[in-house]
Swiss-Prot record:
The gene is acyP. The active site is at R18, N36. Keywords: Hydrolase. Its EC number is 3.6.1.7. Signal peptide: none annotated. This is Acylphosphatase. It comes from Dehalococcoides mccartyi (strain CBDB1). It catalyses: an acyl phosphate + H2O = a carboxylate + phosphate + H(+). Residues 3-91 form the Acylphosphatase-like domain. GO terms for molecular function: acylphosphatase activity. Belongs to the acylphosphatase family.
Length: 91
């Protein structure tokens, strides 16, 4: 199992980005969370699962849902913790 941490930047709040993220993560069998950051222009995403699924997920994060305007995605690969049983939206 692998862990992807991403900070998605741009017009990603108020455009259903976190819901899109949860839908895609669930479809790919990933666990973790998506959370709006306080600056109003970034979403933090942590996802754990199969490497191929995470790479597909990363491509989806780079495009986002129709109303989003993704400007950049900062990524890091970390050690998976297996602390997640599903994919959630954090507030």
């Amino acid at each position: 199992m692998h862990c992807l941490r991403a900070i998605v930047k741009g017009k990603v709040q108020g455009v259903y980005f976190r819901d899109f993220t949860r839908t895609q993560a669930t479809r790919l069998g990933l666990c973790g969370y998506a959370k709006n950051l306080a600056n109003g222009a970034e979403v933090e995403v942590v996802a754990e699962g199969d490497k191929d699924a995470l790479l597909e997920f990363l491509d989806l994060l780079r495009s986002g849902p129709p109303r989003a305007e993704v400007k950049d995605v900062e990524t890091s690969w970390e050690t998976a913790t297996a602390n997640y049983s599903d994919f959630r939206i954090k507030h």
